């Protein structure tokens, strides 16, 4: 199964988590692909069977600048991905009202596209974790199990 990993990061933590997720999915026998700043054309060329987004939140609950162009392009073109499995791993700081707002935007987009959320969005709180890659592993295992089910 081909899994595309979309990522958006302000300070690099979400990128690290996305790279870690790519390694974990490959170890599990999936064909995972992650590229920072990917274009919609690159994503379509990969022809994913499933989607994983790893993103932080910036500003007033917005997506980071490096994910926003892809998000906008997907919203404009609405590719035919209905029924495909997807999940979102969001990083944020719970001291803000817009905690994990970037992840919520991706969940809404996935719902608009008709993608199936196979595991509930994981919200990693930067005020509670210093090892988000490790903290994400049980959730990633659940994501892999859902994809293989």
Regions found by a protein language model. Give the residues of each.
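FMN-binding flavodoxin-like domain, especially the glycine-rich phosphate-binding loop
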Residues: 2, 7, 12-16, 24, ...
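Short acidic loop-to-helix transition motifs that present clustered carboxylates
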Residues: 35-41
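Short glycine-biased active-site loop of nucleotidyltransferases that positions the nucleotide triphosphate
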Residues: 42-46
């Amino acid at each position: 199964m081909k899994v595309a990993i979309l990522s958006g990061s302000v300070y690099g933590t979400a990128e690290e988590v996305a790279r870690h997720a790519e390694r974990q999915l490959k170890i599990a026998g999936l064909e995972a692909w992650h590229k920072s700043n990917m274009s919609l054309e690159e994503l379509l060329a990969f022809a994913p069977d499933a989607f994983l987004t790893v993103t932080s939140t910036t500003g007033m609950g917005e997506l980071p600048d490096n994910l926003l162009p892809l998000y906008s392009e997907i919203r404009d073109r609405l590719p035919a991905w209905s029924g495909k499995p997807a999940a979102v791993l969001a990083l944020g700081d719970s001291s803000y009202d817009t905690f994990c707002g970037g992840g919520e935007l991706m969940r809404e987009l996935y719902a608009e596209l008709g993608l199936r959320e196979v595991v509930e969005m994981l919200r990693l709180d930067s005020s509670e974790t210093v090892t988000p890659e490790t903290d994400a592993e049980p959730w990633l295992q659940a994501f892999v199990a859902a994809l293989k089910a």
